[in-house]
Every structure is written in structure tokens, then in C-alpha cells.
Amino acid sequence: MAGEGEVIACHTLEVWNEKVKDANESKKLIVIDFTASWCPPCRFIAPVFAEMAKKFTNVVFFKIDVDELQAVAQEFKVEAMPTFVFMKEGNIIDRVVGAAKDEINEKLMKHGGLVASA
């Protein structure tokens, strides 16, 4: 798995299945950013999401391009980008639709994303 503080970009189903299985087994909170290269709000939130990954080192952060992995986007019922899905042990526990930095931050705190000490 990627090191702590990184966003794991999955470009194939094989990589996604392997990485999400490892993350689920770790019992850590998982946040998936469903994004698209043509989506301006997605481009706006991407560096913010990367900073969150550095800040919340006990959370596993994924990035999925909906055009590359349509099957995964459909499985998670993604209808707008960006959509952020929060999971624990394979279960969806929350979601945020839109580039809502504060709401994403609140959900990270709510679901156990402990902030690393600086």
C-alpha cells in the first residue's frame, strides 16, 4: 500500500480490488475521491484532498477517475463529481457530493480520522 500521507490513485480494477482489500483489512477509515479530469471542482479540491491525506495519516485515501473505472463508480452509485465516499471494513458509512472542504473535514473527524501531530 502507499505510504501514509499519500492519495492512492487506482487506474485498473485489479489495482483497486487489491488496494481496497488491503485497506479494509487494516480496519482504517477509507475515503474515496471519485473524480474526472474534465471536472473543474474536482481539479479545485484535488490539492486539498492531498493535504488532508498528509494531515490524517491514519486514514486511507483513494482517488478514482470515473472515466477509467466506470464499474467502480457505478458500484458506489456515483452520479456527480466529485463524490467522496467514506468506508470502514467494507461498509459505506457516509458520503459528500461536491467540493465541500469543510464537510469532508467534518466527516473525517466524525468517523475517526485522528489528526497527526505536526
Curated annotation (Swiss-Prot):
Q: Name one GO biological process term.
A: defense response to fungus
Q: Which residues carry this modification: N-acetylalanine?
A: 2
Q: Which Pfam families match?
A: Thioredoxin
User: Taking every annotated instance into account, which residue ranges of this chain make up the domain Thioredoxin?
Assistant: 2-113
Task: Kindly give the CDD domains that the UniProt entry links to this protein.
Answer: TRX_family
Query: Where is the protein found, in the record's own terms?
Result: Cytoplasm
The free-text function statement in the UniProt record for this protein reads:
Thiol-disulfide oxidoreductase involved in response to pathogens and oxidative stresses. Required for the response to victorin, a phytotoxin which induces programmed cell death in sensitive plants. Possesses insulin disulfide bonds reducing activity.
Is Zinc-finger set as a keyword in this record?
A: no
Which taxonomic lineage is given here?
Eukaryota, Viridiplantae, Streptophyta, Embryophyta, Tracheophyta
* GO MF terms, alphabetically ordered: oxidoreductase activity, acting on a sulfur group of donors, disulfide as acceptor
- Disulfide bridge partners, by residue number: 39-42
Q: Which of UniProt's keywords are assigned here?
A: Acetylation, Cytoplasm, Disulfide bond, Electron transport, Redox-active center, Transport
In Swiss-Prot or TrEMBL terms, this protein is called Thioredoxin H5
Organism, by scientific name, is Arabidopsis thaliana
- Which positions are catalytic residues? 39 (nucleophile), 42 (nucleophile)
Please tell me, according to the UniProt entry, what happens when changing residue 42 to S. Answer: No effect on sensitivity to victorin phytotoxin
State the similarity comment.
Answer: Belongs to the thioredoxin family. Plant H-type subfamily.
